């Protein structure tokens, strides 16, 4: 009888221990999947009810340039420049313009450099986003012609109140040194051999001023660009045709009417909509779009984060393009030919 009870207890203990082991393993497995799920979930970028903050810092390029210099990692002077691919930047703006999840787009292009053609494309994309009903708030501490071209497509432009710079979109300039007298004074005889017209490259060594052919070449190049800039800035701000040119030609008079204060002048003539300090801008953004207490400004995502949400869509579109005919292949080449 005792041996029978012992056998029952032994079997019961084994079953009980096995059940506990199974439950323990199940708990470990569920905990593992929960942790992994939390990690993946935290990597997911939420766009609903967010503000897209576009604050690019760098230079816009058609294709980022790679460098393979052996001592690049030991650079101590910080000469490397952040490169932003134009296609990616345009993709962010165009998709954001039709994304109903986003509350608005905040733009600051103070630290962005772009060539004329790239700036015109960015301006077109911002204008299209605004026409699609997306509110765009542009903030700046001061802009020149190309920067203002892009910012002028925003729904609202806010200039930093106490900024030492201002908004001065009044054309292009080209500066060059002419050193003929210098070389004569130091008794250096410069001999330049050139054939044909429009050979202005070496004029810095042979003249003290710009030649008529060099003036003509520069004006032929820059005038169409300036005309396009003016029309887009005027369309973006709702100005009548010719206002940007008038403001540029008469800015000294307009500034004098506002006590020589460039920021007040920009506000008075409509180049910007508001003057605010950064703290006032923060309060204004929170009032318009709301914010949780722990955030310094309305909840939002960066352009890089938003671009990551478009990658899957880009891959599927790329597969479709592979199947299409009559495609044009673009090959970017960099480096020296040896």
Q: Where on the chain are the PLM-derived regions?
A:
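Short, hydrophobic alpha-helical packing/hinge segments within bilobed ligand-binding/sensory domains
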Residues: 147, 262-263
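A non-catalytic alpha/beta surface segment that caps or lines the substrate-entry region
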Residues: 278-279, 285
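Small-residue-centered hinge/linker elements
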Residues: 2-255, 286-338
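PDZ peptide-recognition modules
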Residues: 237-238, 256, 263, 275
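Short acidic-hydrophobic, aromatic-tinged amphipathic segments that line or gate anion-handling sites
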Residues: 157-159, 272-278
């Amino acid at each position: 009888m005792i041996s029978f009870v012992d056998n029952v207890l032994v079997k019961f203990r084994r079953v009980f221990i096995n059940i506990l082991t199974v439950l323990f393993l199940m708990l470990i497995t569920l905990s593992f999947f929960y942790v992994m799920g939390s990690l993946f979930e935290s990597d997911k970028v939420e766009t609903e009810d967010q503000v897209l903050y576009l604050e690019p810092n760098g230079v816009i390029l058609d294709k980022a340039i790679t460098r393979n210099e052996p001592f690049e990692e030991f650079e101590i002077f910080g000469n490397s420049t952040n490169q932003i691919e134009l296609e990616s930047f345009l993709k962010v703006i165009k998709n954001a313009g039709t994304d109903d999840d986003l509350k608005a787009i905040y733009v600051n292009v103070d630290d962005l450099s772009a060539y004329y053609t790239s700036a015109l494309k960015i301006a077109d994309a911002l204008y299209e986003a605004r026409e699609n009903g997306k509110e765009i708030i542009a903030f700046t501490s001061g802009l020149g012609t190309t920067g203002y071209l892009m910012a002028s497509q925003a729904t609202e432009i806010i200039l930093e109140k106490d900024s030492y710079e201002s908004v001065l979109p009044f054309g292009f300039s080209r500066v060059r040194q002419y050193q003929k007298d210098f070389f004569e004074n130091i008794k250096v005889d410069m001999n330049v051999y050139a054939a044909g017209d429009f050979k202005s490259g070496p004029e810095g060594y042979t003249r003290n001023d710009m030649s008529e052919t060099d003036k003509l070449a520069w004006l032929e190049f820059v005038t169409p660009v300036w005309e396009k800039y003016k029309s887009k800035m005027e369309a973006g701000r709702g100005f009548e045709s010719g206002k940007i040119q008038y403001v540029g030609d008469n800015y000294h008079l307009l500034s004098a009417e506002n006590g020589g204060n460039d920021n007040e002048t920009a506000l008075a003539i409509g180049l910007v909509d508001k003057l605010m300090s950064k703290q006032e801008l923060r309060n204004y953004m929170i009032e318009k779009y709301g914010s949780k207490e722990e955030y310094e400004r309305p909840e939002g995502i960066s352009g890089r984060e938003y671009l990551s949400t478009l990658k899957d869509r880009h891959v599927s579109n790329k597969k479709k393009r592979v199947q299409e005919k009559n495609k044009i292949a673009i090959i970017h080449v960099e480096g020296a030919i040896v």
